[in-house]
């Protein structure tokens, strides 16, 4: 077997693996669409995520969502990431990455961190006052910035998203 043939065999194996991976991902999406009984109208997928940056935080924040206390979230959306849109359906995962509920985005607004207000962020349901929220989120986004390679300042654009639970799984 020549080197060229070995190279072609390797390329074919890699391509076949890519096709198997894509097929499995599509089957998972269709399974989740069947499981939830829902489908995004303009997308072939649900965004899947958990709130926070640890399994414990994901479970804690999910509990607030399911109790109706958390109806909004704030996030830093980097240039290469898709921002949420009104009407988007998202699959919220618990700390073990198990689907827990489907939420629908009902409002999206981007503001600088320094322009967020208590009326906005209290909808996150996590803190008792604005100063507590600010200090906790500065710590969170400082960790996030180090992981994702951006610089967090009070001028950082923040995406404020309100949502409603449309299905508990």
Question: Can you name each region flagged by the protein language model?
Answer:
Residues 2-6:
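Extreme N-terminal basic, low-complexity initiation segments
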Residues 7-8, 149:
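Short, flexible coil/linker elements and helix-boundary hinge sites characteristic
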Residues 19, 23-37:
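Short, Lys/Arg-enriched N-terminal segments with co-localized hydrophobic residues
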Residues 32-102, 108-169:
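Mixed-charge, low-complexity intrinsically disordered regions
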